[in-house]
């Protein structure tokens, strides 16, 4: 059997991994991970918001809409709130002096972005099997060999080396961290990237 990795597209951009990790350490000194109340397996620090609207990054808006098969009925169900991704164009003032602002500026010049977030996957945890409305751009910041993303039953480890990936999150997928340290990725919604 030959595995097809076409849903994991490495981009022709690379950032300085040491600067990414430094920026992450700077941000967690001033901001904790947020998520919807009662959801223990999700944490986000939003780097962008709807201009002038700090409430646009709180609660379920940190996560956004997705579809899942939650039980044995096999019926797909929608979860969380629909997000107007294109409205999330303002880089949050508190983080403008970090390397993430440079990363945002470079990415924004190449892609039409929605929300840009730092996402946490805690040790020995996983997401649900779900699909999203659009592809995602990933820049792994901290990872370990036990971290994998699975798209349509194909698993891939994305190394923390400054590489930029676009993943086809419109297909069913999940991410898991089988290691014993946090997995940290910069994740952006990409509104103008099409997979075949």
Each model region followed by its residue ranges:
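Non-heme Fe(II)/2-oxoglutarate
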Residues: 1-103
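Intrinsic-disorder/low-complexity, polar/charged segments enriched in Ser/Thr/Lys/Arg/Asp/Glu/Gln
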Residues: 8-10, 134-136, 185
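A short glycine-rich, His/Asp/Glu-containing loop-to-beta-strand
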Residues: 102-123
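Residues that flank catalytic or metal-binding motifs in active/ligand-binding sites
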Residues: 114, 133-135, 182
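Short, conserved beta-strand element in jelly-roll/cupin
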Residues: 120, 131-147
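Short beta-strand His + acidic residue motifs that chelate non-heme Fe in jelly-roll/DSBH
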Residues: 127-130, 147-149, 158, 167-179
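A short hydrophobic beta-strand segment most commonly corresponding to one strand
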Residues: 137-140, 164-166, 180-196
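A short beta-strand-loop-beta hairpin characteristic of the jelly-roll/cupin
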Residues: 140-160
């Amino acid at each position: 059997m030959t595995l097809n990795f076409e849903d994991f597209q490495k981009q022709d951009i690379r950032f300085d991994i040491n600067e990414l990790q430094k920026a992450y350490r700077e941000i967690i000194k001033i901001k904790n991970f947020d998520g919807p109340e009662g959801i223990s397996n999700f944490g986000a620090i939003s780097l962008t918001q709807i201009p002038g609207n700090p409430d646009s990054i709180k609660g379920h808006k940190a996560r956004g809409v997705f579809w899942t098969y939650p039980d044995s009925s096999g019926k797909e169900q929608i979860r969380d709130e629909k997000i107007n991704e294109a409205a999330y164009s303002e880089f949050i003032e508190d983080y403008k002096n970090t390397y993430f602002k440079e990363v945002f500026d470079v990415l924004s010049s190449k892609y039409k972005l929605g929300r840009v977030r730092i996402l946490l996957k805690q040790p020995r945890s996983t997401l649900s099997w779900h699909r999203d409305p659009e592809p995602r751009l990933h820049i792994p910041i901290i990872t370990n060999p036990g971290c994998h993303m699975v798209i349509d039953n194909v698993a891939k480890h994305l190394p923390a080396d400054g590489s930029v990936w676009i993943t086809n999150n419109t297909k069913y997928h999940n991410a898991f961290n089988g290691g014993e340290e946090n997995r940290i990725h910069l994740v952006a919604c990409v509104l103008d990237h099409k997979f075949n």
